[in-house]
Amino acid sequence: MSAVLDLTCELIARPSVTPDDAGCQALLAARLKQAGFQCDHLRLGDVDNLWATHGLGAPVLVLLGHTDVVPTGPRESWTSDPFTPHIRDGVLYGRGAADMKGSVAAFVVAAEQFVADHPDHPGTLAVLLTSDEEGDAIDGVRHVARLFAARGQRIDWCITGEPSSTATLGDLLRVGRRGSLSAKLRVQGVQGHVAYPEKARNPIHQAAPALAELCARRWDDGYESFPPTSLQISNIHAGTGANNVIPGELDVDFNIRYNPHWDAPKLEAEITALLERHGLQYTLKWHRSGEPFYTPEGTLRAIARAVLAEHIGRAPEESTGGGTSDARFIAPLGAQCIEVGPVNASIHQVDENVRVDDLEALPGLYQRLVERLLV
């Protein structure tokens, strides 16, 4: 097997369901140390974080990834055991194959080869890994970014190995991400018998106009490469299960994916004003997952576009779509951030997989990116 395939299989065999690293970072740190990297373990609580650096000074290029994976779901639904890597018809199967143990393995193989070829390279090459990307994302890169901000750690460029490709490796370059804001809304009513509505207050009826306005609102028309801001209701519940009882309260969960027209405080104020205008008796709890970030045209984008175009024979699509990633914690440090990784068709699914040809091409892509940025 190739170096990257062998290492990916070793990582898949470690059942690192978030936030358990299951020994992945110890394995990777040993390899990076052997290649000459300085490794610092920044563990917090149950979360493992690894910061490995080679070289000194600016510019600083970070390869950002995570060693944790999502749960497998019913293991009997998998064609083969999710933590026993299997290759069938040129495809590697296993939890984390695409998201993102393949990218992490490719980072390490590319870093090893780069420092072997350029032992005295300018600037600093760093690898940052966490076991808290798929979970709460509090004690992982968010924590490390706070440490970096406190000590003035500079980061110029960040390449995240999230599975960004859609049909073929390198067909999409992620140049930003939307912000994410979640809310839990509870509308208070008065429970009663459906035959005596005058003695009750139905929170469903009261909240319906406000929810309709929230869902119908056009928040903006997009922002540069970003789509329009979107609010989606994800859960709604009221009632006792009986059809003769007016419920006493209504619970609604919703999420907003927003572009740089907005920030979390502005959205919170806007929605609070709407609820107040409808005269609801309510409580509202917010959870801020991260603000949007965007990498404008510049050195990193231009080099990444050129490297991917060489691989696929055409310019990649450049997008800010998809969910959140840990790059949202690195961007506020002043870094230009992009995401380049495998095809994402099977991520978080039963029989997650990556094409072996794509996996074996990935270290070369990453190494070319590093060389053009640092050499």
Swiss-Prot record:
Subunit comment: Homodimer.
Cofactor: Zn(2+); Co(2+)
Single GO MF descriptor: cobalt ion binding
The keyword Metal-binding appears for this protein: yes
Swiss-Prot/TrEMBL catalytic activity: N-succinyl-(2S,6S)-2,6-diaminopimelate + H2O = (2S,6S)-2,6-diaminopimelate + succinate
GO biological process: diaminopimelate biosynthetic process; L-arginine biosynthetic process; lysine biosynthetic process via diaminopimelate
PANTHER family in the record: ACETYLORNITHINE DEACETYLASE, N-ACETYL-L-CITRULLINE DEACETYLASE
UniProt record similarity statement: Belongs to the peptidase M20A family. DapE subfamily.
Database matches in CDD domains: M20_DapE_proteobac (cd03891)
Cofactor details (free text): Binds 2 Zn(2+) or Co(2+) ions per subunit.
Pfam family of the protein (one): M20_dimer
Name of protein: Succinyl-diaminopimelate desuccinylase
List of residues binding Zn(2+) 2: D99, E134, H348
EC number, as in UniProt: 3.5.1.18
Source domain of life: Bacteria
List of residues binding Zn(2+) 1: H66, D99, E162
Active site: D68, E133
Function as written in the Swiss-Prot or TrEMBL entry: Catalyzes the hydrolysis of N-succinyl-L,L-diaminopimelic acid (SDAP), forming succinate and LL-2,6-diaminopimelate (DAP), an intermediate involved in the bacterial biosynthesis of lysine and meso-diaminopimelic acid, an essential component of bacterial cell walls.
Pathways per UniProt: Amino-acid biosynthesis; L-lysine biosynthesis via DAP pathway; LL-2,6-diaminopimelate from (S)-tetrahydrodipicolinate (succinylase route): step 3/3
Keywords: Amino-acid biosynthesis, Cobalt, Diaminopimelate biosynthesis, Hydrolase, Lysine biosynthesis, Metal-binding, Zinc
Gene name of the encoded protein: dapE
